[in-house]
């Protein structure tokens, strides 16, 4: 399906503030849907969703650069979107992308109609340790990527494995992987956003190996009136592992 995506919606490069950013855009007929992958992923990470929704929505999936902090990343993304004529949009983020989506809403709530937070967090501290931070700071980008790809190579053969080997192993630069993983370790809790919780969808998986039960409960408590969907056996990548269930839940919420 990645080859189908690349043929139908090839990556384009947008320059903002002197930084070149890869995006996948569909220019569909409906409202813009901004999609933000996690720390390990590219603008093509949501290939199944982009192919499913690309005609009905103007999907803009962004391989965002790592910034000084999440606030600066979000400001850059808002400037990027404005530069391509997008001022109002729905946003879907997964993992660190979900964290970043909340910063976008915090900085510019009037820009966002609905927000989908998949396998995400608002408080990163449970995922942070001094050891992880020091290891990343003391490792070269190349070493970090080698370690990530090595773990993928040892995983069970599946669509997830083959897709991530392509997206991360061949598509994501060592610097991007290290910078985003560092961003997770340096992140701070998202300030309280002024946004209707009826316009928020939380997606979690009961077997997510990266977002532990306490982090899942924390984001639910943070947005107690948000809509909430559990995808069973979706792992950390339900949009690949359980695409039908994921697409149905998100599509219903966003009225696609």
Predicted regions, residues:
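Catalytic histidine-centered segment of alpha/beta-hydrolase-like enzymes
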Residues: 234-247
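Active-site loop/oxyanion-hole signature of alpha/beta-hydrolase fold enzymes
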Residues: 45-51, 58-92, 248
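Conserved alpha/beta-hydrolase catalytic His-Asp/Glu region
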Residues: 126-128, 142-195
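Flexible "cap/lid" loop of the alpha/beta hydrolase fold
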Residues: 102, 106-107, 113-142
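Short beta-strand/loop motif that positions the catalytic acidic residue
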Residues: 196, 202-204
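Conserved HGGG/HGGXW glycine-rich cap/lid loop of the alpha/beta-hydrolase fold
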Residues: 12-67
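Gly/Ala-rich beta-loop-alpha elbow adjacent to hydrolase catalytic centers
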Residues: 93, 97, 101
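Acidic catalytic loop of the alpha/beta-hydrolase fold
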Residues: 207-211
């Amino acid at each position: 399906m990645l080859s189908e995506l690349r043929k139908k919606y090839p990556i384009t490069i947008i320059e903002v503030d002197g930084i070149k950013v890869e995006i996948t855009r569909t220019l569909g007929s409906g409202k813009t849907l901004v999609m933000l992958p996690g720390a390990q992923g590219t603008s093509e990470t949501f290939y199944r969703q982009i192919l499913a929704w690309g005609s009905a929505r103007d999907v803009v999936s962004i391989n965002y650069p790592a910034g000084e902090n999440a606030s600066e990343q979000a400001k850059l993304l808002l400037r990027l979107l404005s530069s391509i004529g997008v001022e109002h949009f729905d946003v879907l983020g997964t993992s660190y992308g979900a964290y970043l989506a909340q910063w976008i809403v915090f900085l510019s709530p009037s820009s966002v109609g609905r927000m989908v937070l998949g396998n995400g967090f608002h408080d990163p501290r449970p995922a942070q340790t001094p050891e992880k931070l020091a290891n990343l700071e003391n490792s070269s980008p190349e070493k970090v990527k080698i370690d990530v790809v090595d773990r993928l190579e040892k995983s069970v053969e599946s669509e997830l494995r083959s897709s991530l080997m392509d997206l991360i192993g061949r598509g994501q630069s060592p610097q991007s992987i290290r910078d985003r993983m560092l961003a997770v370790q340096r992140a701070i809790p998202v300030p309280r956003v002024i946004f209707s919780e009826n316009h928020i969808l939380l997606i979690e998986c009961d077997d997510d190996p990266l977002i532990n039960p306490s982090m899942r409960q924390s984001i639910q408590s943070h947005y107690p009136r948000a809509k909430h969907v559990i995808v069973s056996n979706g792992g950390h990548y339900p949009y690949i592992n359980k695409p039908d269930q994921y697409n149905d839940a998100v599509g219903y919420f966003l009225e696609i």
